[in-house]
């Protein structure tokens, strides 16, 4: 048996702060705990017959250790327990290979360590107590130190990764012919198939008619393919409500909305995503995506793609993993639209129960509520689910630009408890596709069936059926665990590149059809792909991550990061070359047959004769052999008989002396209302360079934007907008009103981006409801009817969506239902992505005037509002969109004012009511307000806290009369409420109702209240001292001051530059994700830009002799599993071809390089920057030993990924790319998890600074270098943000200037920067081009 080698690593630097967080968490439960120490253990499966030789051991030690610390890796543990110590080791369950292992193995392969085939990382803790620890203390410690769903305790070091050596035998066929339905009932129970009584009868009868018994695999397959999750029986079924048969199914009703909207859908209800008619745009693409080649500018018609789905059950069981795979699955839905689409950006939403944050009292949360052991607690969901979705997007390279977060746990007047025990994890995605790739081609006999993506693992077996269980918790916990998946964004990124290579293929896209793998695994996706022609599939042709998988697991596992496609045999070579270049597996698993059947052949068990002497081969088994029409064809409608169950209503009873200020003390802290900074700061909001509007606005980057806007190309101001609407708490009172409000909220958010026309707006409708429990199915039907009616009145339509109809969980003997929820994602084409208005007030000092346009004028209903929830009630009558025509008129007028640039800011009235809307605009603008709301005869509380839909606008004084007249002439009310006040820390909010002052308080104090819940959550997910520093800073800050010195050069590129155009290689590695925006920046500056991969360099496919520049791009090479850019550095250092090529390039005096983010981390590891300037820099020698760097980029001091619109100051120095920019103070995107500049010694740092080799510093609001968080997002000493070589040719930066070369990419532009003709950051790239033209080069 091959050995498992152990490498123990002690933490160094501030990463040891993790021990402090563990200590704080444990000491609450274990007061005698004295200290916590940690170490990591890399458990390496060494598959060679002999142990590593000396050179291989050196490589392993370098990979696992810290380059700045000698002897921090050992093969014996550093931590040894004493008599009062507990030594605990925890790590991943071994039934699957983790994504971290996959990436570490890839790094080892790149370093030439071919014998490494699995590496799992465990964490070891030494807990020291005052006395000898008890077994109970050990149990408490273990529970706190690991996630029992995905991890386990290791009492002893791992000795083997192989639980068994051969596939587990399959059970025999299900004997329906002899036993009838009971045989199927038994299989249903044992396999967790979630078949209901109708299913059991139907399949028993079908197999009796066929006169054969189904195999175990076939029964499993049918359960997944025909589960509620996959078939949507309820929405397509025949519904009877209170004895009355509905004329149409819900699905038919939803489709009918298309009749009242413009016919601009190019895809609807028929593909992995929907799509609407786009615009012609110019864009860059490589000349040949299978080899290194030059980017060329092209033009074509690009459509807008949108999809949305939820991943609720897996997220409830294992929040981080469930959310990663929910995000990954939705990304694949975008990828697989038509014959391949471009992923652009995502949206995210979370609904969870009462948080019960330790030592933070939210008085509406009932402390007596119990929670089940088989679901994660709401607090864990809020933090870990958002961590999972954020981490996946960050590593894949998809920005998240909009979302929602909502909490509810409430006892209704009838005694029922409603709470999101089973949470909602919502993921939406917007993308683009070429018009010529809209239609999938039908399968034809002889076509190749191909799986692209990760290998098969025993992951997510039965997820489609498991998520369809009527009440979660009725399945066994083992089966629930088996249905949870794990995400590998690195693999998905590689797979995305293969699909993009096909989409951009010079000879035309070879993909004929494409589908993503999700619920039901291979069984579902390969049937869908081959329908109706049929296919034969061979188990031996799949790449297995685990050789012990049996046929059922190969066929049914929902392992992630896998797509299936069809192509003609003549295109096989193209796909093989593209996948090899991107290092992504592509398995040709079968062919289209034309016999209308799906057949799985388990040919792994086909032996060549028993004696090996040429006996006739055994017939391989066929675990699946089904008629496709029988499985996928039109099935009989299921019938559902539903009864309405009117809610028990109770008038809202607020404390009699409740003041507006006291109400705000609660409402501003409710998660649905409060700041979402804890979500936005940890997710990349700029990657890809196509983001025109993300969540954060104003000088303090407050997360309040109503709409997300993206470009269809870097080179155009044409794009798309999307906005969300959801009001589930109101559904507990009136499902119809809740549906109307969801639609209206999506549109009052979308209205602040300029779109082509209201009737062009299309929507994804996602339904999360416990529809099969008493009263809930009828409530959903009512909500659907209301949504259809209001959309017809508005002229918008649904073109896609998903449903999740088992939104209930068992808590003891009680069934706890979640509120019925409809999430509307509206999207449309933007003819001008720069014509967007944000909520932040922009004209302080009385120059901004505030107008209010109520859409249900005269109404002030409080039912289901944030105010009611904050007093543990619902009330009776919810807000509503009484007059849809008001919204139509308001939408058109607001859009016209956007075109005319007459609106300065705008925000919709929603959760928290009018007072929250006004205060949020003040918070975002860091600006005071003075307003008076006229509402004669109405008490201040309903006036201010009712959530009736409406708009609040800021206009300048000269436009007040004209804007009011526009709305009022259309029959709408438009009230002038007041004006802005002073800006900065002294800003005051003075709010009156009917001339009586109800709020008079500093904006900063109210904002601190609104931010408090977010900061409490942040304290649990980031380094507390950083959180406290940011909290304090918000109270004192005025906002950044940008500066361009008079000597700053005017950015200009000759249209036809003389002489040869200089070449720059955009160099990327596995996991890089910042290459396209980097290519755009250099192209804009006049370079000939080439797409080059590390695989190209390592294979000798290209040489760098003709290139003047190399850009090392941002991202997560190898997911940064062994430290930032460590894997990339290993590939450069240990591959002779790459080492020689880059070494020769560096030695040439006529070359330059730019390393950004991951590229910056790489240049530091390679020693291109950060080395001792007084010593001649050595390069890796022929013995391929790594350079000893002087600088290492370590984890941010906050302990998490940081996404910020930060400020930097450009310093004098030799950096050629920053010439003429010295003295500038500029904003720039920053997005990284490991940006802390750790020098080998303070002396080295001082030398580097003295030589002027630090050309960029993080700057405070006064433009001075800073270490203050988050102005310095990573905590680097002295505020260092960039570093260059002595000769200035090599520049390494942690921020992303390539994401800010176009002004529409900027997150905030104060005057006078709002009228600049070009972005100052373009000059950085122009400087590089100008340098290449100098005679000295």
Curated annotation (Swiss-Prot):
Q: What is the lineage of its organism?
A: Eukaryota, Metazoa, Chordata, Craniata, Vertebrata
Arranged from A to Z, the UniProt key words for this protein are:
ATP-binding, Cytoplasm, Glutamine amidotransferase, Ligase, Magnesium, Metal-binding, Nucleotide-binding, Phosphoprotein, Purine biosynthesis
Q: What is this protein called?
A: Phosphoribosylformylglycinamidine synthase
Q: Which residues carry this modification: Phosphoserine?
A: 215
Q: Which InterPro entries match?
A: Class_I_gatase-like, FGAR-AT_N, FGAR-AT_PurM_N-like, PurL_large, PurL_linker, PurM-like_C_dom, PurM-like_C_sf, PurM-like_N_sf
Q: Give the EC number(s) listed in the UniProt record.
A: 6.3.5.3
- Which residue range or ranges hold the Glutamine amidotransferase type-1 domain? 1063-1301
Which residues participate in ATP binding? 322-333, 402-404, 705, 910
**Could you tell me which species this protein originates from?**
Mus musculus (Mouse)
Compartments reported by the entry: Cytoplasm
User: Which pathway is it part of?
Assistant: Purine metabolism; IMP biosynthesis via de novo pathway; 5-amino-1-(5-phospho-D-ribosyl)imidazole from N(2)-formyl-N(1)-(5-phospho-D-ribosyl)glycinamide: step 1/2
- Keyword rRNA processing applies: no
Q: Which gene encodes it?
A: Pfas
Ligand binding (Mg(2+)): 706, 745, 749, 908
| Major localization listed first in the record, in broad terms | cytoplasm
Which biological process terms from the Gene Ontology are attached to this UniProt entry? Answer: 'de novo' AMP biosynthetic process; 'de novo' IMP biosynthetic process; 'de novo' XMP biosynthetic process; anterior head development; glutamine metabolic process; GMP biosynthetic process; response to xenobiotic stimulus
Any idea what job this protein has? Phosphoribosylformylglycinamidine synthase involved in the purines biosynthetic pathway. Catalyzes the ATP-dependent conversion of formylglycinamide ribonucleotide (FGAR) and glutamine to yield formylglycinamidine ribonucleotide (FGAM) and glutamate.
Which Pfam families does the record associate with it? AIRS_C, FGAR-AT_linker, FGAR-AT_N, FGAR-AT_PurM_N-like, GATase_5
The keyword Nucleotide-binding is annotated on this UniProt entry: yes
As for family, the record states: In the N-terminal section; belongs to the FGAMS family.
The record's Gene Ontology cellular component field reads: cytoplasm
Sample GO molecular function, one term: ATP binding
Phosphothreonine sites (modified residues) = 619, 622
Q: Which residues form the active site?
A: 1157 (nucleophile), 1296, 1298
Reaction(s) this enzyme catalyzes, per UniProt: N(2)-formyl-N(1)-(5-phospho-beta-D-ribosyl)glycinamide + L-glutamine + ATP + H2O = 2-formamido-N(1)-(5-O-phospho-beta-D-ribosyl)acetamidine + L-glutamate + ADP + phosphate + H(+)
